[in-house]
């Protein structure tokens, strides 16, 4: 019967489900960058809109001034170009 099967499955997999919930909660918290960091990145973006590809040195400087990792800087620019840039 369905109720018995449900009970068995819950008994067998409840630990896994709990771990999955914890993992999902951890990952959800990482979605937004701090407001100040976003503002600094957007300022750079606006100044360089025609060619929004920071050099490695500029990425290092942005990482230091925002407190973000360089990978986060790279990902932000990739996403920003994909979503908002219309090359002229």
Curated annotation (Swiss-Prot):
ELK domain location: 4-24
Main subcellular localisation: nucleus
Subcellular location(s) per record: Nucleus
Tissue: Strongly expressed in ear inflorescence primordia and shoot meristem. Weakly expressed in embryos. Absent from leaves.
DNA-binding residue intervals: 25-88
CC annotations in GO: nucleus
Keyword line: DNA-binding, Homeobox, Nucleus
InterPro entries in the record: ELK_dom, HD, Homeobox_CS, Homeodomain-like_sf, KN_HD, TALE_homeobox
An MF annotation (GO) of this entry: DNA-binding transcription factor activity, RNA polymerase II-specific
PANTHER family the record matches: HOMEOBOX PROTEIN TRANSCRIPTION FACTORS
Function, as annotated: Probably binds to the DNA sequence 5'-TGAC-3'.
Stated family: Belongs to the TALE/KNOX homeobox family.
Name listed for the protein in its UniProt record: Homeobox protein knotted-1-like 3
Protein's organism: Zea mays (Maize)
Gene: KNOX3
């Amino acid at each position: 019967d369905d109720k018995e099967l449900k009970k068995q499955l819950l008994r067998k997999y409840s630990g896994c489900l709990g771990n999955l919930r914890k993992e999902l909660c951890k990952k959800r918290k990482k979605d937004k960058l701090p407001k100040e960091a976003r503002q600094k990145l957007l300022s750079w973006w606006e100044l360089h809109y025609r060619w929004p590809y920071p050099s490695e040195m500029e990425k290092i400087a942005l990482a230091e001034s925002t407190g973000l990792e360089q990978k986060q800087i790279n990902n932000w620019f990739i996403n920003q170009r994909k979503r908002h840039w219309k090359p002229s």
